Design a protein with these regions (language model features):
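Long, low-complexity, Ser/Thr/Gly/Pro-rich intrinsically disordered segments that act as flexible linkers
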Residues: 7, 17-19
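Extended catalytic/binding region for NAD+/ADP-ribose chemistry, centered on the ART fold
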Residues: 56-82
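Active-site-proximal loop/hinge segments that shape catalytic or ion-binding/gating pockets
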Residues: 2-12, 27-58, 75, 85-135
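Residue-level signal for the start and early helices of compact helical domains
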Residues: 20, 37, 42, 60-62, ...
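A short acidic (Asp/Glu
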Residues: 19-21, 76-80, 100-102
Length: 135
């Protein structure tokens, strides 16, 4: 787990140009673009539920940015996230300390939260099939 990177999957042909002229990774509230659900109200509901409404009135820049933890260091990234793009950015290791991690898609009402330093309760929820499918 010590080397598990946080990555951001993306479609190079449609999203890479957003990264070229910017100094920050922007969320859909800032760009109005998404490879997932684009509904602001749906995403606001998920984030309100996950974070007890702490981001409800936040500016777009202050809102959640989404990525995934490549806990098995698969060179193809996280296979369950391939729908967001086959390519990905590898974030610097110190970013992990500022991340909230879920055991499943964050839109799920039953998603459990953790952090990189407090993650074992999430790993214990993985089935053998989920772990094996990562290899």
């Amino acid at each position: 787990m010590h080397y598990a990177p946080i990555i951001i999957h993306m479609h190079v042909n449609t999203h890479f140009h957003f990264f070229l002229g910017d100094t920050h990774y922007r969320n859909q509230f800032e760009t109005s673009k998404s490879s997932g659900a684009l509904s602001h109200s749906a995403r606001t509901g998920w984030e309100d539920r996950m974070f007890d409404r702490k981001h409800h009135n936040a500016t777009g820049f202050e809102r959640v940015k989404y990525g995934t933890m490549n806990f098995v260091n698969d060179p193809k990234g996280v296979r369950a996230c391939a729908g967001y793009g086959q390519s990905y950015f590898l974030l610097k290791p110190h970013v992990r300390d500022r991340c909230t991690i879920t055991d499943m898609d964050s839109s799920s009402p039953s998603a459990t939260l953790g952090t990189f330093r407090f993650i074992f309760h999430l790993l214990m929820k993985l089935s053998d099939a989920e772990v094996n499918s990562a290899f």
